[in-house]
């Protein structure tokens, strides 16, 4: 069954219930959340996440396979500052606990940045961090994200992800998030040869590890190593390629999450595009006037 949704907000008093309500308003049947602000470690206690009411709403609206995204401040690739590494490991463990409490099975993680020490050192540090953070009997997988390769990011190739996975003791607890914008920006030709890229991924990492898809267009040409998301059909990947990926038979059971930019000039008037983009990906017809329609809605 096609599970298609977007990033939604989990905040205020409603928390998980509010996230599910927002997702339902977009015509989604899955969604992705941060457990709090992605740029800090301030988090509400689990009992204040309004989980019971949220799960009831999800059940009533056929929401399933929801995904949690770990915050950007976690960098377990940092071998220069021990305090940054330690914070990353400890906070990742507490985020795994929140993910489990929310009933999600996947927590998306940017593998980490080597901060100038080189990819090999960064990957070694990430392996150490994951070995420390993972508890062998947990039922949550860390879904390492394919990265664009901007700055000192690790995980910019399938080989780097495989290297991390191979080094982790309990690697049955690792999966992969395939981000279309990142993979395109990293240099993979998902526009003209997605099947070839998927076969390559299968040979190097294993398609059985692909548990989350981030569906984003890209503002940049292939191989730019930039990571700038564009609205569906309005970037260098294009609608046809993204529609093909969303409906790919080998990925039928993988939840697909949109992280495309809000539409509008100033912050106050920006609007979420997800209701329109989800409808477009379902019906298979690109609307070149979509951004104007969203702005004027």
Swiss-Prot record:
Q: Which GO terms describe its biological process?
A: base-excision repair
Residues annotated as binding Zn(2+) 2: 145, 179, 214, 259
* Residues in coiled coil: none
Q: Does the keyword DNA repair apply?
A: yes
Which Gene3D superfamilies does the UniProt record give?
Divalent-metal-dependent TIM barrel enzymes
HAMAP family xrefs: Nfo
- This protein is called Probable endonuclease 4
Lineage, broadest ranks: Bacteria, Bacillati, Bacillota, Bacilli, Bacillales
Q: Which gene encodes it?
A: nfo
């Amino acid at each position: 069954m096609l599970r298609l949704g977007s990033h939604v907000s989990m905040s205020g008093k409603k928390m998980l219930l509010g996230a599910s309500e927002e997702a339902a308003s977009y015509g989604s049947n899955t969604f992705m959340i941060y457990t709090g602000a992605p740029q800090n470690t301030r988090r509400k206690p689990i009992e204040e996440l309004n989980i019971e009411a949220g799960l009831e709403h999800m059940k009533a609206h056929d929401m399933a396979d929801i995904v949690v995204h770990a915050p950007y401040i976690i960098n377990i690739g940092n071998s220069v500052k021990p305090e940054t590494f330690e914070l990353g490991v400890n906070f990742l463990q507490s985020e795994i606990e929140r993910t489990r409490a929310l009933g999600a099975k996947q927590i998306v993680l940017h593998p980490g940045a080597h901060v100038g020490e080189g990819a090999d050192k960064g990957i070694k540090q990430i392996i150490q961090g994951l070995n420390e953070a993972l508890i062998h009997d947990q039922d949550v997988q860390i879904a390492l994200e394919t990265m664009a390769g901007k700055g000192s990011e690790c995980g910019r190739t399938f080989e780097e992800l495989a290297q991390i996975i191979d080094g982790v003791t309990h690697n049955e607890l690792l999966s992969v998030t395939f981000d279309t914008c990142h993979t395109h920006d990293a240099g993979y030709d998902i526009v003209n040869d997605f099947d070839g890229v998927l076969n390559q991924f299968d040979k190097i990492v294993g398609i059985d590890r692909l548990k989350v898809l981030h569906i984003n267009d890209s503002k940049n040409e292939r191989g730019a190593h930039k990571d700038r998301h564009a609205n569906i059909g309005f970037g260098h990947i294009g609608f046809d390629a993204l529609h093909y990926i969303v409906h790919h038979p080998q990925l039928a059971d993988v939840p697909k999450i949109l992280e495309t930019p809000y539409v509008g000039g100033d912050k106050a008037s920006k609007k979420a595009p997800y209701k329109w983009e989800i409808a477009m990906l379902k019906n298979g017809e690109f609307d070149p006037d979509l951004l104007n329609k969203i702005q004027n809605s």
